[in-house]
Amino acid sequence: MYYTKLNYLVIFSCFLFFIQSLVLKSQTFKLKREFRGAYIATVSNIDWPSDKNLSSEKQKTELIDILDKLKAAGINAVIFQIRTECDALYNSSIEPWSYWLTGKQGRAPEPFYDPLEFVITEAHKRAMELHAWLNPYRAVKNNNSYPLAGNHVTNQHPGWILKFGELKILNPGVPEVEKYILNIVKDVVERYDIDGIHFDDYFYPYTPVKNEDSLTFKIYQSNFTNIQDWRRNNINNLISDVYQLINSINPKVKFGVSPFGIIENKYAGTKGFESYKVLYCDPLYWIDKKIIDYISPQLYWEIGHKSTDYGKLLPWWSSVKDSRHLYIGHFSSRIADENYSGKKSELGDQLRMNYQIQNVNGDIFFSAKSIVNNYSGLADSMKFFWYEFPALLPEMNWKDSIPPLAPVNLKSEKIIDGIKLKWSEPDSARDGEYPRYYLIYCFKEDEDINLGDPTKIINLIPAVQTIYIDKRLYSGKRGNIYIVSSLDRLWNESRQFSITKIDK
């Protein structure tokens, strides 16, 4: 095979990423519980589908390939974009099918299938969470880029729309707009077995609002005299009402938001864009009022950046997370890209820093393609170093603290392929829940049984399976004591477990 100078440079960069991960491995904490998320962005076909005109079968094949590669890299949660521009990548009676799915807004996939239902099923097969990602306000990303369907909200309710150049958004100050968004969330939570609802950073637009909503303010200002405070209140009301709505329908469904990483510069000594003053979002209010389950700030800058230093923002966010989960957003598609001009070790350095900050509960990578396409060896580094062992998602005891019962009748036997484990499903726990997953550990005979040690976890499987075959062939690596525990939907682990010993 012929290698150019560029080929060698790319290979060498990947090699450096591997070596750096190896060196740092001894310095990192192996955690039994952490959120390892990846965004699957559908707008502009960033991650999926690769083209707007694919057949349904090709779309499914691509999605399965993405999930398989994310799973192999150790990812345990997927943030799947289902609403990009007041459209739907699911079967909605409220909004039109997405242009990014079929090449024509309002046209369903042919042959028909429901992408959200499909990705939920496939994610759960792999013991991965599936969070439905919605852009709450964005209606048109780029005006006139494609024809809008007749039932698009801009055609149905033109009075709800604010325009900023080529961008159109739903007006957050109009009460009917919030009702409309809540109805969409309600529809998704009621009809789909999702694990979470996720909002990103798009509230009021990055193009600063001037007087576009001044008339709305006059009509709906209530007791507010300051339009900036009124705008923030509009966003806060939406976040609060979404949280209450989700809990009224299914309290096991999580709600998280990934805001822009800087609220105000005064907090972490930064000199960047302030989302509190432009996007009018107030994450500290959401955390204080406990109207979200997790916060995932987009810390898309480098450690040591002169104006927006990751190294300053991370500890600040960890200090304000309170009792909610903190998952750090990484721009892996940029800083792991082979053409990235910064340090090749940047992403590894960020992960190491996260492990050193105890209040960080996990990470979310934007976007999936950086892992699927193994940018700079990222997927390999995850698989063999950072995420070498499966991880459970962090518990949310404010939502559910009742553990499931342990599996029963665990038996083991040697077969040609390895060691076969078989067990039975337990009764329901006192909250009525059955196991959603099973966790399998393996210990050597001379080892202490420590279920807090994630290096002893060999697999995490969906509860539809009650048979598992350990196919690891190297007897020196494989122990002979197997333990199986149960996990419920919110990752509470059974207090008891089943144990079996196989003769060497």
PLM regions and their residue ranges:
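Pro/Thr/Ser/Gly-rich low-complexity, intrinsically disordered linker/stalk tracts
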Residues: 377-432, 491-504
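Active-site-adjacent "subsite" loops/lids of carbohydrate-active enzymes
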Residues: 41-61, 132, 137-191
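Catalytic domains of carbohydrate-active enzymes, especially glycoside hydrolases
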Residues: 61-87, 191-195
